A protein has these predicted regions:
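Cleavable N-terminal signal peptides of Sec/SRP-targeted secreted and luminal proteins
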Residues: 1-16
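Primary mode marks residue(s) on the alpha4-beta5-alpha5 output face of response regulator receiver
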Residues: 17-304
Length: 304
């Protein structure tokens, strides 16, 4: 915990400075117009932290790699489903990360799953305010938030070729499923930070190794149950990471999750404004986040 606080202090320096900076941006061989280039998502990692054994964990991006690494099929064995698209795979029965592969075996998206038994008994979480994008998986008695990296309506129809996977990597866009029909109920998270201007995405703080945070319709006097479960992260003006959250303390057998500190000072490193309810909510019910990184070496490159 002390190390986490130390790193948080370092992040505060970046938050206070709010200056786009990276130690590699002054490297003489770096591209001068990298900020204008399209994001290239060349990896898929989850988990933020200071422990190298449990943070920035690389995930397989092909079904064959997943099988080699011990991932197993989860639920139905067909690609197209009623409430999501893709062949689902899970590692050691931990629903914190459920990978979705297209019909050809290439990464197509991922889900964060939370078992009902791990949530408050009064069923207050997730709240109606965020249902959807939280969608109930009644077959497994859990709640899911689903993101896709390619168009959902292509995942189980044509999928991607090996050439397309090599060219685009993890994907080209970030889609958030916002209803029960995965092929039609989704929004696309803006790929460029400039496209958030004039929207209800509230700019937050820059935190080194993560990026510039944005939170949907964040307000000081909001109810914490309204906290939107996805927050995008931008570096050099481009989307290259995002986070998922739920307002409860939930376990992850494979150590995927992060547990924010119940402190306004801590939340000020990421949010502006900080909702008044957040410290007490975290003390009473907890808070769980999952960071997802789409480009290599976030420790070195994600400096906003």
């Amino acid at each position: 915990m002390k190390l986490l606080l130390l790193l948080a202090i370092l992040g505060a320096a970046a938050a206070a400075e709010q200056t786009p900076w990276s130690p590699w941006r002054w490297w003489p061989f770096s591209s001068s117009d990298s900020a204008a280039a399209e994001p290239h998502w060349n990896t898929l990692k989850v988990g933020w932290g200071i422990n190298p054994l449990t943070s920035f964990q690389s995930l397989p991006r092909t079904r064959s790699e997943a099988v080699k690494q011990g991932w197993t099929m989860y639920g139905r064995t067909t690609c197209a489903g009623t409430y999501w698209q893709g062949l689902r795979m899970i590692y050691q029965d931990d629903p914190a990360v459920i990978l979705l592969f297209d019909r050809n075996g290439f990464i197509a998206g991922m889900q964060m799953g939370v078992k009902q038994s791990d949530l408050p008994a009064d069923r207050s979480i997730p709240a109606r305010d965020v249902i959807p994008p939280w969608v109930q998986d009644r077959n497994n008695d859990m709640w899911l938030i689903t993101t896709y990296f390619i168009r959902p309506d292509t995942i189980c129809t044509v999928g991607r070729t090996a050439t397309e996977f090599q060219a685009k990597g993890t994907g080209a866009d970030l889609y958030l499923q916002t209803g029960a029909s995965p092929r039609t109920d989704f929004v696309i998270i803006p790929k460029y930070e400039k496209d958030l201007e004039g929207t209800d995405w509230t700019p937050g703080k820059c935190f080194w190794t993560m990026g510039k945070h944005y939170f949907k319709n964040l307000r000081e006097n909001m109810r914490c149950e309204e906290l939107y479960p996805l927050f995008p992260l931008y570096n050099e003006g481009k989307l290259n990471a995002f986070g998922l959250l739920i307002g409860a303390s939930v376990p992850s057998p494979t150590s995927r999750y992060e547990s924010p500190i119940a402190s306004k000072t801590f939340y000020q490193l990421f949010m502006t404004p900080v909702p008044k309810c957040l410290q007490s909510h975290t003390e009473e019910k907890g808070m769980t986040t999952l960071h997802v990184f789409l480009e290599n070496d976030p420790r070195l490159n994600n400096f906003c």
